[in-house]
Regions:
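Short basic/aromatic-enriched segments
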Residues: 63-77, 84
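Extracellular "spike/adhesin" assembly and maturation modules
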Residues: 1-64, 80, 89-106, 112-116
């Protein structure tokens, strides 16, 4: 039986010979692909885009609608033609592409960011 790490939520600790490759490892790889080296296209788009490409990521703002409703401050990642959501940890960094800013996640939400 695996355990879950408290930082990225990755599964680990399978006993020797136990197969964790299927659902456990797939979830790990998808999470790593979504949050490592994080950049998002936008953070103030309240309606999910109509034709997102797989790999597109957004920070969900307050007052988001549709499938993003109730996901404020989460990372919405388009994977296999569906949205997956990841809750950032305090200190997570994200490059906001349309603003050319680097933002940090704090207890109050995402910072305004620094132009880079």
């Amino acid at each position: 039986m695996s355990s879950t790490d408290p930082n990225l939520g990755l599964n680990y600790g399978w006993t020797l010979g136990e197969s964790g490759w299927d659902t456990g490892m797939d979830a790990n790889l998808k999470r790593l692909g979504a949050v490592v080296g994080l950049s998002v296209k936008d953070r103030d788009l309240t309606t999910p885009p109509t034709s997102p490409a797989n790999g597109d990521r957004y920070i969900v703002p307050a007052a988001a609608t549709g499938v993003w409703a109730g996901k404020t401050n989460q990372i919405a990642a388009r994977i296999a033609d569906a949205w997956e959501y990841h809750t950032p940890k305090i200190g997570s960094l994200c490059y906001i592409e349309d603003e050319a800013k680097l933002s940090a996640f704090k207890s109050t939400g995402w910072s305004a960011g620094l132009a880079i």
